From Swiss-Prot:
Sequence positions that bind NADP(+): 166-168, 191, 232
Keyword Hydrolase among record annotations: yes
Domain of life: Bacteria
Family assignment from sequence similarity: Belongs to the tetrahydrofolate dehydrogenase/cyclohydrolase family.
One MF annotation (Gene Ontology) recorded for this entry: methylenetetrahydrofolate dehydrogenase (NADP+) activity
Function: Catalyzes the oxidation of 5,10-methylenetetrahydrofolate to 5,10-methenyltetrahydrofolate and then the hydrolysis of 5,10-methenyltetrahydrofolate to 10-formyltetrahydrofolate.
EC annotation from Swiss-Prot or TrEMBL: 1.5.1.5, 3.5.4.9
Keywords: Amino-acid biosynthesis, Histidine biosynthesis, Hydrolase, Methionine biosynthesis, Multifunctional enzyme, NADP, One-carbon metabolism, Oxidoreductase, Purine biosynthesis
Name of the molecule in the record: Bifunctional protein FolD
Gene name of the encoded protein: folD
Claim: Transcription is one of the keywords in the record: no
HAMAP family assigned to the protein according to its UniProt record, in alphabetical order: THF_DHG_CYH
Amino acid sequence: MSAHLIDGKAIAAEIDARAGEVGAKLASSLGRPPCLAVVLVGEDPASDVYVRNKVRRTEAAGLTSIEIRKSAEATEAEIIAIVERLNADDGVDGILVQMPLPGHIDTNRVIGRIDPDKDVDGLTEVSAGRLVLGKPGLRPCTPAGCVLLAERALGDLSGKSVVVIGRSILVGKPAALLFLEKNATVTIAHSRTADLPSLCRTADILVPAVGRPEMVRGDWVKPGACVLDVGINRIDAPERGAGKTRLVGDAAFDEIVGHAGWITPVPGGIGPMTIAMLLKNTVIAAALRAKQPALADF
């Protein structure tokens, strides 16, 4: 048996297109397309590439983007002032502050100033509270993308055994809560978990999200399981030539693909879904602000 590859790029393209369709409907009532504002502080190369991809996909879907760049020397007060200005701007529906921020800026304080109704990354305390309480709200993009891919692969997730490796507020914890919303049985594993390989072998759905290259080995995955690899790691690839690198996930793809039921590749799996869910959240935020909740359900 060879695993089915879950094509995150193709599914993300469907969501982008749907976001564009709904955004076009909203434009007539808003007088403009839904708008995403992205704040980038400093010159981190990976963040720069990611922001450019976000802006490109946003505009390709027919939505509007605003990109605000500040130097790494910008003060915390300056960044908070930008966030508050965007909060007050009726022409902005979603706000995203690209992380990581420079070390002298308190990320929690900056994120905490984002209007929860414009929090398209789903990271404010209000957004987290809505998720924990099961109330409607904007959900964190990467975890939401994981759940959507799992549903595309397996259908109804009710009763499925899910093991999430990692307990970060960005992926691990919200992913666990989102799978619980789908009536799955969820276990969160972490660095203190005893006998992690045995625990992983119980999973119908395995979600490694720790940033450790190929940590999950082939014999950690039971036959037929669905592996949603959130990790994206750059490692040396001497076979490609001196100084060359390649991207790998947190799961050892070549060891797993032969007996898993479903698996996301890296790249091309979870990554594209993160931006797709960001566009979806931007449109949802715009629909709710326009008092058209029916358009927020897609």
